Amino acid sequence: MTSRNYLLLTPGPLTTSRTVKEAMLFDSCTWDDDYNIGVVEQIRQQLTALATASEGYTSVLLQGSGSYAVEAVLGSALGPQDKVLIVSNGAYGARMVEMAGLMGIAHHAYDCGEVARPNVQAIDAILNADPTISHIAMVHSETTTGMLNPIDEVGALAHRYGKTYIVDAMSSFGGIPMDIAALHIDYLISSANKCIQGVPGFAFVIAREQKLAACKGRSRSLSLDLYAQWRCMEDNHGKWRFTSPTHTVLAFAQALKELAKEGGVAARHQRYQQNQRSLVAGMRALGFNTLLDDELHSPIITAFYSPEDPQYRFSEFYRRLKEQGFVIYPGKVSQSDCFRIGNIGEVYAADITALLTAIRTAMYWTK
């Protein structure tokens, strides 16, 4: 364990502000109105407002990582007669397929490959051919590659065919402007430690109330029962069914204040975009190539091909960067040797410049 802070160039957990960390120095009682009404309920209202100005939506917080909330939605939203079309082009779409299989949920997996954008015409054809499909689920920002998927076009299909639409916006909500009502999203899933720049400990679901109310008695799990969690928070003014991650919640409340102070989602999106563009330009100047074409990139994380030099080892490159105070991500693409660099969190233009200088220094195989 080290006492030194590194700049995390990852898609979350990410580098947080000092004030977000300091918010966790306070201890809260989970039965206290100051906490449940004063903090939890305020967070729920703010999340819903960030997602849409339209009526009929609500927010539910759930202990655990983002995957817990994805599993809660799949396990609660789909009844025994339902079937979900899962659009997959990375590890997180594949994880939804695995979850559906383990829970015995009928599903059709449309796997378009890790470096390909989902083909909307192909999705249209699947929906047209199989009227038993009741739900569509997909990832927005697929951090396996840095791909930004077309949730608007798929949402239009979901609306046209009358399907319930589930979007894993884990690494995009709070960092990319969106209106979930306009996108026809029924369940949006995200996490505390992503673009809102909190710390790990809980995830959240912003859902259409009418859809959520229909989930009663459907859950395949006790602790991941999304309907029961929602009703507990509604009926008890922010109370969690099981132990609330109080310190994480306080940090998140502070992170929401800092998002507003920055200028909201639009301003944060602009910063993330500039970070990503500067990173890509600088890396290309150093001789690195991106895995994806520019038009496919999200402003969240970028995958770069590993150097072909026989001396190159990611572990050594990583170590040399870490010695200089920067932490990057290994690759997760099955067919390509690459590594990834995120640019969200408390990361600014000067940090990207410093990172590029550190990368130049760490390129031992060029010496």
Swiss-Prot record:
Its EC number is 2.6.1.37. The modification N6-(pyridoxal phosphate)lysine is found at K194. GO terms for molecular function: 2-aminoethylphosphonate-pyruvate transaminase activity. Keywords: Aminotransferase, Pyridoxal phosphate, Pyruvate, Transferase. It comes from the Bacteria. InterPro entries: Aminotrans_V_dom, NH2EtPonate_pyrv_transaminase, PyrdxlP-dep_Trfase, PyrdxlP-dep_Trfase_major, PyrdxlP-dep_Trfase_small, SP_NH2Trfase/AEP_transaminase. Its cofactor is pyridoxal 5'-phosphate. SUPFAM superfamilies: PLP-dependent transferases. GO terms for biological process: organic phosphonate catabolic process. It catalyses: (2-aminoethyl)phosphonate + pyruvate = phosphonoacetaldehyde + L-alanine. Pfam families: Aminotran_5 (PF00266). It is an enzyme of class 2 (transferase). Belongs to the class-V pyridoxal-phosphate-dependent aminotransferase family. PhnW subfamily. Involved in phosphonate degradation. Homodimer. This is 2-aminoethylphosphonate--pyruvate transaminase. It comes from Salmonella typhi.
